[in-house]
């Protein structure tokens, strides 16, 4: 008989009366009245093994096994006794009467029980091998595998070719910091790990491969958050001779296919499309969570002439904004709740949080409760009530500052209230999946520190045709042929139509204050390729980690990556990064500079 004939979790009634050989780990060992029960676990689940004292040698072995021992069991599949069926297990109607028990490897006492749901992330990541044995982690990584398989199936059916691109490439810092790799044979020179395969996939389009994809690692040396890792995985795609709408349709279908085939979720038949300007105006975010039924009300123009300087000053400032957020039934929020929200918005740069409770709208000023009402004239109050549509029992929150501060703070407050227990109880948030496309992004953003424009996405994104003239006259007016797919407030994919003409790419570099010599040094290979009849092309990249995190309902992408890094970009399992010896550094022509000691 083979070492293993069946997986533990797949032993069911169809094997009744048969002898099976199982391998796995001891989840739990119980001694009941002289009979030993072992819950045996493998990747497919659990099966109950019964060890009877009639088989003395086997029973003696069973008495010595402990949790996480790796064992082999040979035995007879039989029905469980009446009243002992476990409906929660696929194998819950049967058990295996053990004939032979072999310890394949003993285990020291684990540092935690695998069913402990209150482990710290540090403990889990330090003992990641044991953490990965837990059913939820097994589920997450198998879900990840299925998502990748379904993406490959779809792309294969659509004529895409899987082509690998280099991991050791050229550093072209235009965004996040690169991870650098020193070259031993080229002293003083460095490779960079790719932040994306962007330029190589464009070159593949010039090379007539027409449709490319790759599920690949990307690397960015940036500060980490719950949805970031220094190395992450993209479903990276590029296609020739398709316009923006056609590209969106193609990959919208892919995401629908993946959700249906992996978790049996039917996404919208057609995703809504929202311009960036509308998303920022209504939600203060370019990745709005449409499950939350709260929206901003624009008040900037109505607050220009009020005596209340908190509102009028930003209303009359070039980059200022005044916006309101009406919360239905919010008048029941306590002063403690409001104080908590006030402290919360300070995280995003807000200096405070103004509010008005609407007790009786018909009474006008006298029906309102607020510390700011005395600073507003009747016309301003009427404008606020009219524009927000506030009703009796509502509360209206206000933000007034630079537009970025208003958008960030009020946008975060919108999500916090919507997803709170109050929000759920009052129908301010829906369940389910709310996808959309956000389009027409600004081509450039102005960097005050560098006193120049920088690319909002990357410098290879095509401007909209009607905005080409602005590249040399007013870059800030340029909109890009860029698009992000957003799902429940997460950007799960982003892409654009690319620049395929060398003269346009050179104009974009000039708008970014990248001179001809610098452009040739950094991107000469691209500029050269674009001169050989480069086709119109565009693409998109999806964050595999993010998609699986959402599907699994996980708190962090670290829960869907086998061996992730911490928020300090460290691997607690292997203790990477770590020092290297002096000999290796000499071979790489590197001398470390010791950090300066603080002066006493």
Curated annotation (Swiss-Prot):
Marked site: Important for tRNA non-discrimination: 32, 83
One of the record's GO molecular function terms: aspartate-tRNA(Asn) ligase activity
Pfam families: GAD, tRNA-synt_2, tRNA_anti-codon
Reactions performed catalytically: tRNA(Asx) + L-aspartate + ATP = L-aspartyl-tRNA(Asx) + AMP + diphosphate
Binding site for L-aspartate: 174, 220, 457, 498
Chain spans, region Aspartate: 198-201
EC number: 6.1.1.23
Record: residues binding ATP: 220-222, 229, 491, 543-546
GO cellular component, one term: cytoplasm
Chief location of this protein within or outside the cell: cytoplasm
The entry's keywords: Aminoacyl-tRNA synthetase, ATP-binding, Cytoplasm, Ligase, Nucleotide-binding, Protein biosynthesis
Compartment list: Cytoplasm
GO biological process, one term: aspartyl-tRNA aminoacylation
Function statement: Aspartyl-tRNA synthetase with relaxed tRNA specificity since it is able to aspartylate not only its cognate tRNA(Asp) but also tRNA(Asn). Reaction proceeds in two steps: L-aspartate is first activated by ATP to form Asp-AMP and then transferred to the acceptor end of tRNA(Asp/Asn).
PANTHER family per record: ASPARTATE--TRNA LIGASE, MITOCHONDRIAL, ASPARTYL/LYSYL-TRNA SYNTHETASE
Subunit relationships: Homodimer.
Membership in a protein family: Belongs to the class-II aminoacyl-tRNA synthetase family. Type 1 subfamily.
The protein's name in its UniProt record: Aspartate--tRNA(Asp/Asn) ligase
UniProt lineage: Bacteria, Pseudomonadati, Pseudomonadota, Betaproteobacteria, Burkholderiales
């Amino acid at each position: 008989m083979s070492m293993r004939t069946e997986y533990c979790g797949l032993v069911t009634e169809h094997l009744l009366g048969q002898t099976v050989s199982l391998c796995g780990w001891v989840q739990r060992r119980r001694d009941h009245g002289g009979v030993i029960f072992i819950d045996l676990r493998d990747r497919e689940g659990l099966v109950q093994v019964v060890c009877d004292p009639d088989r003395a040698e086997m029973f003696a072995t069973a008495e010595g096994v402990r949790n996480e021992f790796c064992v082999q069991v040979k035995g007879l599949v039989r029905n469980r006794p009446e009243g002992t069926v476990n409906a929660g297990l696929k194998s819950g109607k049967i058990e295996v009467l053990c004939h032979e028990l072999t310890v394949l490897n003993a285990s020291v006492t684990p540092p935690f029980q695998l069913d402990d749901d209150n482990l710290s992330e540090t403990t889990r990541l330090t003992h990641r091998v044991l953490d990965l044995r837990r059913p939820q982690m097994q589920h997450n990584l198998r879900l990840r595998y299925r998502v990748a398989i379904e993406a490959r199936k779809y792309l294969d059916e659509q004529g895409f070719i899987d082509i690998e691109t280099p991991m050791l490439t050229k550093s072209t810092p235009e965004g996040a910091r690169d991870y650098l790799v020193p070259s031993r044979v080229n002293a003083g020179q460095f490779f960079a790990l790719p932040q994306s395969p962007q330029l190589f996939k464009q070159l593949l389009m010039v090379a007539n491969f027409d449709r490319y994809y790759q599920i690949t690692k990307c690397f960015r040396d940036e500060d980490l958050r719950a949805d970031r890792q220094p190395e992450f995985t993209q479903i990276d795609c590029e296609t020739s001779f398709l316009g923006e709408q056609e590209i969106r349709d193609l990959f919208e279908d892919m995401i629908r296919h993946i959700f249906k085939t992996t978790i049996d979720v039917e996404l919208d038949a057609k995703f809504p499309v929202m311009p960036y300007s509308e998303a920022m105006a209504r939600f203060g975010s370019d990745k709005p969570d449409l499950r939350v039924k709260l929206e901003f009300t624009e008040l900037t123009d109505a607050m220009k002439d009020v005596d209340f300087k908190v509102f009028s000053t930003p209303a009359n400032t070039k980059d200022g904004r005044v916006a309101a957020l009406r919360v239905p039934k919010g008048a029941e929020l306590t002063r403690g709740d409001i104080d908590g929200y006030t402290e919360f918005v300070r995280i995003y740069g807000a200096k405070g949080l103004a509010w008005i409770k609407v007790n009786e709208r018909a009474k006008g000023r006298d029906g309102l409760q607020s510390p700011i009402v005395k600073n507003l004239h009747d016309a301003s109050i009427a404008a606020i009530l009219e524009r927000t549509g506030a009703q009796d029992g509502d509360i209206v929150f206000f933000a007034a500052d630079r537009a970025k501060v208003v958008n960030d703070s009020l946008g975060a407050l919108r999500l916090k209230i919507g997803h709170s227990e109050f929000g759920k109880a009052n129908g301010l948030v829906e369940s389910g999946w709310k996808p959309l496309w956000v389009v027409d992004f600004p081509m450039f953003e102005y960097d005050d520190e560098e006193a120049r424009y920088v690319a909002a996405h990357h410098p290879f994104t095509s401007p909209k045709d009607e905005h080409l003239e602005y590249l040399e006259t007013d870059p800030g007016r340029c909109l890009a042929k860029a698009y992000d797919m957003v799902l429940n407030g997460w950007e799960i994919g982003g892409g654009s139509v690319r620049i395929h003409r060398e003269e346009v790419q050179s104009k974009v570099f000039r708008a970014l204050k990248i001179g001809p010599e610098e452009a040739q040094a950094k991107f000469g290979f691209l500029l050269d390729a674009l001169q050989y009849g480069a086709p119109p092309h565009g693409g998109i990249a999806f964050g595999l980690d993010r998609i699986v995190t959402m599907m699994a309902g996980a708190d962090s992408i670290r829960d869907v990556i086998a061996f992730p890094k911490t928020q300090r970009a460290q691997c607690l399992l292997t203790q990477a990064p770590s020092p290297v010896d002096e000999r290796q550094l000499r071979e790489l022509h590197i001398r470390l500079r010791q950090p300066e000691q603080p002066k006493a």
